[in-house]
Design a protein with these regions (language model features):
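Short secondary-structure transition/capping segments
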Residues: 77-80, 137-140, 264-266, 310
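A generic local secondary-structure boundary/capping motif
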Residues: 72-73, 114-117, 125-129, 142-149, ...
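Short beta-strand or tight-loop elements
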Residues: 123, 153, 175
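Anion-binding (especially nucleotide phosphate/pyrophosphate-binding) glycine-rich loop
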Residues: 2-135
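Gly/Ser/Thr-rich helix-start
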Residues: 36-37, 69-71, 80, 108, ...
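Structural signature of FAD isoalloxazine-binding scaffolds in flavoprotein oxidoreductases
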Residues: 35-36, 41-47, 74-92, 140-172, ...
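Conserved active-site and cofactor/substrate-binding residues in soluble primary-metabolism enzymes
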Residues: 2, 6, 27, 45-48, ...
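Phosphate/pyrophosphate- and phosphate-bearing ligand-binding catalytic cores of soluble enzymes
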Residues: 21-22, 73, 160-283, 287-288, ...
Length: 346
């Protein structure tokens, strides 16, 4: 893609210290251990460097794919002609400016965030202590477990809004949180960090709850195998794992991809899974569950399609706006001329 190639050249010329990897295999980053190369993989050292990368992409009509720990994503083996921006170096974590709050940048792991909250006697993030993701991804998908969700503890979110090239703070109540999704999925932005509003509690009591949740997780989930977390979102009135199990699909295998024999809600890589294996496996499960129960399962894993391109069409949008303004100006001028011609001297 011409715009992407231009952006890469400008970034290399103007940001020589940036960790920029060309033709980077995504299997090296994704927890499922599947995926071909993306055209470029940028790892900014801080928010300013990340903003600069996004500026060059924006000016060349390209949108990036911003990722954290890549724990719920699958890339095609053929690779994609896109740039991925990793938030892994955005790891600032501190107590917030207001009482009982914590500020964390997008790359902070949810486990580290929960531990920091515990160490400071702040309760509310226990549920997140075993979720294998980062703050950015957790906020984007409203991650949750054991009855808790990110929306319950988010006071505000800091995003880089691409159309205006500016940092914006969004109140938690304005984030459009729903079950395993947020309003940020619908706008051209990147999550940079978040402020969490928590409740004071005894650190030992917080730690005990975290330990109990993590012991349950270890006992019930296939943490010893590559996976992308829960394969499907929880349907209304039930659980995906229970439906899959009831339909006799626990252990169902396509190539190297398998519905876990330990927990039917997980798809795992038995060692040689491919993108096509995962797609076929999940598609079969969805069709079979629907055939037997008339319930449609919605994937929780983000599977990026083959040939996907990310375009920022701001120039076209801007031109459309300008054309509309010019047309309106013509109409206004025509209206004024008509009014003038109606005026007759007395």
């Amino acid at each position: 893609m011409e715009g992407l190639e231009k952006a890469i050249e400008q970034i290399k010329e103007n940001m020589p210290k940036l960790d920029l990897r060309e033709n980077e295999p995504m299997r090296n980053h994704c927890s499922f251990k599947v995926g071909g190369a993306v055209r470029a993989f940028a790892v900014p050292s801080d928010l300013f460097e990340m903003s600069k990368v996004m500026f060059y992409l924006h000016m060349n009509g390209v949108s990036p794919l911003t990722l954290g720990k890549c724990t719920n994503v699958i890339f095609p083996e053929e690779g994609l002609d896109i740039m991925v921006i990793s938030t892994e170096n955005l790891r600032k974590l501190r107590l917030g400016e207001t009482e009982n709050t914590i500020y964390a940048e997008a790359g902070v792991s949810l486990a580290k965030l929960a531990q920091f909250a515990r160490d400071n006697g702040l309760s509310g993030l226990e549920f997140a202590s075993g979720i294998p993701g980062s703050v950015g991804g957790g906020v984007l998908m409203n991650a949750g477990a054991y009855g808790g969700e990110m929306k319950d503890v988010i006071e505000s979110v800091v995003v880089y809004y691409v159309p205006t090239q500016a940092l914006t703070e969004v109140r938690g109540s304005d984030c459009g949180f729903e079950y395993r999704r947020s309003g940020f999925e619908k706008i051209n932005c990147a999550i940079m960090g978040a402020v969490f509003k928590l409740t004071p509690d005894d650190p030992e009591a917080i730690g005990a709850r975290m330990k109990e949740m993590n012991e349950k997780r270890t006992a019930s989930q296939p943490l010893d195998m590559p996976s992308a977390g829960s394969a499907f979102k929880r349907p209304v009135g039930g659980y995906a794992a229970a439906l899959i199990d009831r339909c006799g699909l626990k252990g169902y295998t396509v190539g190297g991809a398998q519905i876990s024999q330990k927990h039917a809600g997980f798809a795992v890589n038995t060692g040689s899974a491919t993108y096509d294996d995962v797609v076929e496996l999940l598609d079969h499960v969805r069709r079979e569950v629907y055939a037997q129960t008339q319930i449609t399962l919605e994937p929780e894993i983000r599977i990026y399609p083959k040939g996907m391109m990310l375009v920022d069409d701001w120039r076209e949008r801007k031109q459309t706006i300008i054309d509309g303004m010019l047309e309106q100006a013509k109409q206004n001028a025509a209206g004024s001329a008509a009014e003038s011609s109606d005026v007759r001297p007395s």
